[in-house]
Amino acid sequence: MNILKSKELFKEAQNYLVGGVNSPVRAFKAVGTDPIFIQRGKGSRIWDVDGNEYIDYVLSWGPLILGHAHDQVVNAIKQVANYGTSFGAPTELEIEMAKAVVDAVKSVEMVRFVNSGTEATMSAIRLARGYTKRKKIVKFDGCYHGHGDSLLVSAGSGVATLGIPGTPGIPEELANLTIVLPYNDIEAVEEAFKRYGEDIACVIIEPVAGNMGVVAPSKEYHQRLRDITRKYGALLIFDEVMTGFRLAYGGAQELYGIDPDLTTFGKVIGGGLPVGAYGGKREIMEYVAPVGPVYQAGTLSGNPLAMAAGLRQLQLLKELNPYRELDEKGRFLEEGFKQIAQEFSAAIQVNRVGSMITVFFTDIPVKDFATAKTSDTNKFAKFFRCMLEKGIYLPASQFEAFFLSTAHSQKDLEETLEKARECFKIL
């Protein structure tokens, strides 16, 4: 496969962009090759600047649940752009988009739009602290909630990919307010609340972890979290930036039947444009300015382009209700990967929830970050490079999810497994 132009662009990019990229995992550092530069995408496919075609399972890290450049989403953006791209003032689209989120997600009575998932989680944490008048927060080892200071402790995603345990620039005094616990260990949560319960403002969790690779919650885990947080007067925050409108129209909380106090959103709700949101019970959300004392603002928050793209995507998801179809596609890939691994006696674990999948290169069942880290990252890197060479674009990290879209055809899935079989032969 020729990627000469991508290599030239990456070399040039490093003169102007830190590491040649605007987000660390894009540099392909963990998989031992140079990144490909994308020229265009349509449906389930992307094309790089050298003209190579790929079946895409990154989908911009999750937002493109209807595939690349969906005609109706693109048209919605075009129509709005003709009238202006940003006003820094209220628009009717913001109301329509807010109503769509509130109607879809049972626990959300009010919402505030921001520009990224990181902004959403940072704002939700500030709100939880302001509402409860407490300082400490609980997060889980390997869960990634953006790059806000309070949350970039024992994080997943690019932090895990690059093997960074924490990061310089976060004061120890602030980091000490974050209690980090193992995912799926309810006893650890109970113990933490026994020790610090009166000081804990909130628990924030990915209801299905995606940033250490896909890890599902154990049975009754979320209900126990809900019970414990209620008992101690702490807020439960579901970070549904990845899972919201992807695992079900009402998100992971619909799937598991749990009503958190606050929810953060991103990715799917923007239709591929920059967006984030946080929402929850009216009583809590009315602590946010201008109604309440907790300040949060943004020049481009609720901008018309993101609202138009997101609203059209949510409308289509409601009309199509593709979640059973997406689950079936996910199951087909999951079973296919497992069968191939069995053929070659390969030590892998395939974790999946709906249209999110991770193939872990380990013989140990993955239920938390500690078990995820037993994966052979070198073997994953070889698998990644082999699949890329054969036209299958996967996340460039062992600790990320593959995403499916409505645009992925049965032929795409079969071709993916065929190429995977060829790669497992080499491995």
From Swiss-Prot:
Pathway: Porphyrin-containing compound metabolism; protoporphyrin-IX biosynthesis; 5-aminolevulinate from L-glutamyl-tRNA(Glu): step 2/2
Lineage: superkingdom: Bacteria
Pfam families: Aminotran_3
Entry keyword Isomerase: yes
Gene3D superfamilies according to UniProt: Aspartate Aminotransferase, domain 1, Type I PLP-dependent aspartate aminotransferase-like (Major domain)
Class of the enzyme per the UniProt entry, highest EC level: isomerase
A GO biological-process term: protoporphyrinogen IX biosynthetic process
PROSITE patterns: AA_TRANSFER_CLASS_3 (PS00600)
Family: Belongs to the class-III pyridoxal-phosphate-dependent aminotransferase family. HemL subfamily.
Name of the protein described by the UniProt record: Glutamate-1-semialdehyde 2,1-aminomutase
Native source organism of the sequence: Sulfurihydrogenibium azorense (strain DSM 15241 / OCM 825 / Az-Fu1)
